[in-house]
Regions:
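Phosphate-binding site recognition
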Residues: 1-124
């Protein structure tokens, strides 16, 4: 049985004007599981970051404002090659506004990189 959220993910992935997706919801309801499953099915590779106390990751989004430098740093941190249009980058447990702000440049400049940020905290 396919979940309604999977249909939403497919529409998001195929949208011409795709922006980073911020998935907000209560804790422990399956957000991360559903995104990881979607990544396994739909992408060549899935790059997962748990942002809890990840100072290196936070530093990337605080310091860099170039999409290419952010992608390069994420590749180095994960040890994975991030492919345009064929990698899903998951940022889990996002509570830092700097990460959300950093993702906004991918909405305005590059829709070739597929980001999903998962949080249980509403952005202020």
């Amino acid at each position: 049985m396919e979940r309604k959220i999977e249909e939403f993910y497919h529409k998001w992935k195929n949208d011409i004007i795709r922006k980073p997706l911020v998935l907000y919801g209560a804790k422990q309801i399956g957000k991360t599981f559903s995104v990881l499953e979607f990544g396994k099915k739909e992408y060549k590779n899935t790059v997962y970051f748990n942002t809890d106390n990840n100072k290196e990751l936070l530093g990337v989004f605080k310091k860099e404002r170039s999409t290419e430098k952010i992608i390069l740093n994420l590749s180095l941190l994960s040890g994975e090659t991030i492919l345009k249009d064929d990698s899903l980058i998951i940022l889990d447990n996002v509570i830092e506004n700097d990460i959300i702000k950093g993702l906004k440049i991918f909405g305005s400049e590059h829709s070739k990189y597929h980001f999903i940020a998962i949080t249980s905290k509403k952005e202020k």
